[in-house]
Amino acid sequence: MNKILLQCDNLCKRYQEGSVQTDVLHNVSFSVGEGEMMAIVGSSGSGKSTLLHLLGGLDTPTSGDVIFNGQPMSKLSSAAKAELRNQKLGFIYQFHHLLPDFTALENVAMPLLIGKKKPAEINSRALEMLKAVGLEHRANHRPSELSGGERQRVAIARALVNNPWLVLADEPTGNLDARNADSIFQLLGELNRLQGTAFLVVTHDLQLAKRMSRQLEMRDGRLTAELSLMGAE
């Protein structure tokens, strides 16, 4: 069995506005192993995105904890969480969030710049990742000059440029047509095999989720079942 990379222990999240309390997550517990490909399946409003924010240290749980590589997130300072996100975690969103005035190469290089890598390393590594996603020939193009599928591939290259241990992906194919969505999931699987990166993908699409090695279902802020989607139609 692979070493546990990330573990959730009874995560709860409650928002309060005035006298109104809204419970978004209820005692969520699960783990992700090194190199694992996992999907969390649920409809809009089920709590999937809130969960990813907690896993990435972008928000704080009301109770419970997230443990990454044996280290509780609750014990980390804001600076330590930021360093963790830069070095060990990657993020992919439904919208690519590329910087419009920068080229594909410059967008991919951004996490390396933040991590204060050497200039020569920054350029070579960013170009290496663009090649890995099949876009080295588009390195000097801005996002407005790329197709939707190409923009998402650049976003994936950016998420993986620092060799993270785990990538958190929030509906990564939600804005793509079926052909491009299929291409993106094939790419994630290939990067998992080549680099050993673990992926945790939240999605509402069963056809896409079945490509992952493990699937959990979320309803109304609760993990309700482990699914078996092999051969799902």
Curated annotation (Swiss-Prot):
<dbReference type="GO" id="GO:0022857">
    <property type="term" value="F:transmembrane transporter activity"/>
</dbReference>
<dbReference type="InterPro" id="IPR015854">
    <property type="entry name" value="ABC_transpr_LolD-like"/>
</dbReference>
<protein>
    <recommendedName>
        <fullName>Lipoprotein-releasing system ATP-binding protein LolD</fullName>
        <ecNumber>7.6.2.-</ecNumber>
    </recommendedName>
</protein>
<dbReference type="InterPro" id="IPR017871">
    <property type="entry name" value="ABC_transporter-like_CS"/>
</dbReference>
<keyword id="KW-0997">Cell inner membrane</keyword>
<keyword id="KW-0813">Transport</keyword>
<keyword id="KW-0547">Nucleotide-binding</keyword>
<comment type="function">
    <text>Part of the ABC transporter complex LolCDE involved in the translocation of mature outer membrane-directed lipoproteins, from the inner membrane to the periplasmic chaperone, LolA. Responsible for the formation of the LolA-lipoprotein complex in an ATP-dependent manner.</text>
</comment>
<dbReference type="InterPro" id="IPR027417">
    <property type="entry name" value="P-loop_NTPase"/>
</dbReference>
<feature type="domain" description="ABC transporter">
    <location>
        <begin position="6"/>
        <end position="233"/>
    </location>
</feature>
<keyword id="KW-1003">Cell membrane</keyword>
<dbReference type="GO" id="GO:0016887">
    <property type="term" value="F:ATP hydrolysis activity"/>
</dbReference>
<keyword id="KW-0067">ATP-binding</keyword>
<keyword id="KW-0472">Membrane</keyword>
<dbReference type="GO" id="GO:0089705">
    <property type="term" value="P:protein localization to outer membrane"/>
</dbReference>
<keyword id="KW-1278">Translocase</keyword>
<dbReference type="InterPro" id="IPR017911">
    <property type="entry name" value="MacB-like_ATP-bd"/>
</dbReference>
<dbReference type="InterPro" id="IPR011924">
    <property type="entry name" value="LolD_lipo_ATP-bd"/>
</dbReference>
<comment type="similarity">
    <text>Belongs to the ABC transporter superfamily. Lipoprotein translocase (TC 3.A.1.125) family.</text>
</comment>
<dbReference type="InterPro" id="IPR003439">
    <property type="entry name" value="ABC_transporter-like_ATP-bd"/>
</dbReference>
<dbReference type="Pfam" id="PF00005">
    <property type="entry name" value="ABC_tran"/>
</dbReference>
<feature type="binding site">
    <location>
        <begin position="42"/>
        <end position="49"/>
    </location>
    <ligand>
        <name>ATP</name>
    </ligand>
</feature>
<dbReference type="GO" id="GO:0044874">
    <property type="term" value="P:lipoprotein localization to outer membrane"/>
</dbReference>
<dbReference type="InterPro" id="IPR003593">
    <property type="entry name" value="AAA+_ATPase"/>
</dbReference>
<dbReference type="GO" id="GO:0005886">
    <property type="term" value="C:plasma membrane"/>
</dbReference>
<dbReference type="GO" id="GO:0005524">
    <property type="term" value="F:ATP binding"/>
</dbReference>
<comment type="subunit">
    <text>The complex is composed of two ATP-binding proteins (LolD) and two transmembrane proteins (LolC and LolE).</text>
</comment>
